[in-house]
């Protein structure tokens, strides 16, 4: 894991870096840790994004409530939202990028609720670790994560579909 607060470095070479830096430890993870996870992936109706979504799952197949996790933008996404690149324009005042959680029960059926979290939107850009409540999913075995947004370059969602997460809290 890495951190990079220089948005001029925020290209695909820093797709796994976060913009956040803890003031006490100097590391990029939530609560000052060195480690965090980065996921990439999206699905839309463009026909260009048809791969599997990034996910987390319980390998033992037992459903549990994922209470919350902390999320933030990667430096790559932060740079493109602010400055654009060859594939996307900078985010405008009405643009948005959000995460959508899609839960699955022990039978592999999708649960009814899909919690959303805006990384970019009316509230601003999320450059620090922020708690995302996932408890509305109820007991799940697997959660897919879709990164979607309003920027479309004619080939579907055009912002980098990366997000970082840390400190996943599970109820046992």
How should each PLM-predicted stretch be described?
Residues 61, 91-95, 159-162:
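A generic structural micro-feature
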Residues 70-120:
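Extracellular ligand-binding interfaces
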Residues 53, 76, 150-152:
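A short, flexible beta-alpha/helix-coil linker loop
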Residues 61-68, 139-140:
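Extended extracellular/luminal ectodomain segments enriched in beta-structured repeat modules
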Residues 54-58, 133:
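Short, T/G/N/S-enriched strand-turn elements that build extracellular solenoid repeat scaffolds
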